[in-house]
Amino acid sequence: MTEGRPVKERTYEMESRYLSPYAKKSAETAGRAREEVPCAFRTDFQRDRDRIIYSNSFKRLKNKTQVFFAPEGDHYITRLTHTLDVAQIARAIARALSLNEDLAEAIALGHDLGHTPFGHVGERVLDKLSPSGFEHNVQSLRVVDVIEKDGRGLNLTAEVRDGILQHKSSGHPATLEGVAVSLADRIAYINHDIEDAIRAGILKDSDLPQNAVAVLGHATRERINTVITDIYLRSAGTDGVHMSENVADAMNELRSFMFRNIYSLTNKSMQDRAERMLTAMYGYFLRYPERLPEQYLALAENAPKEQIVCDYLSGMTDRYAIGVFEGLFIPETFSLGGVTV
């Protein structure tokens, strides 16, 4: 009989009974940097997921570019839709391998919170400008640790923080759920970026490398299903999350194709404009840091001004960045004797 037991305790029992021995059980979390009163209903990983969803940084993802700047259609991918794709794929992998779905989902929802406006162009610009460099995964961790909640951060669990920091392909997550998110990120962005490129008229289906298509499938749903199925067959019952060599090679071939034909060529004029805007604003706020919003000024007590300027710029949406740039550098028109100046 479990009806009278606390909801969270029932969750712990179910995880102990049904999750893989290699999964991170919610009851085994290493905890938070600051102790908190436990929730009677939610596990710590479930609380992390909710905190991320309700954060301001998560809300702003809907107006941050994935690949195509300010697309005019309704169905192009943004950072928010990419994040939701990653969360769905990560949960599917976790479910197939009997891993902790709540942990995988929380990591996935937080993995891109520190991404810049204007996609990877913005990241490259800030990396070049900042003396300490800039990586969106490191900034995502700073968002949840420091920037959110007026400098208090979200106080997430160690496992979610690790997964956010280590989600890049070069990372080494401490949990299998973190590995699942890293793979899900790659699966998601390669496939939906192909969709966007075809939608924009830059690619045709027939342009894709046929060796990779033969392995993975023609349609997005086929490719995603092929990879998740392969991960399951390769990883079930083991202490890892892997693709087979054949499928991994096909994914890498698609990724290389996209870098050669899309990521390095997409709307060069817009990329140049984005670089000029971010460079100009970076220089302006370094010179006049007192003109930063108050919430960022408050962070300056514990970080150099270069970091605080990067905090502000990386947190902008595409539209907000354009608006701030115009407000700083584009003269307003006004009427003088009936003539607009």
Regions found by a protein language model. Name each.
Residues L103, I107-D150:
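A generic, well-ordered mixed alpha/beta core segment in the N-terminal half of proteins
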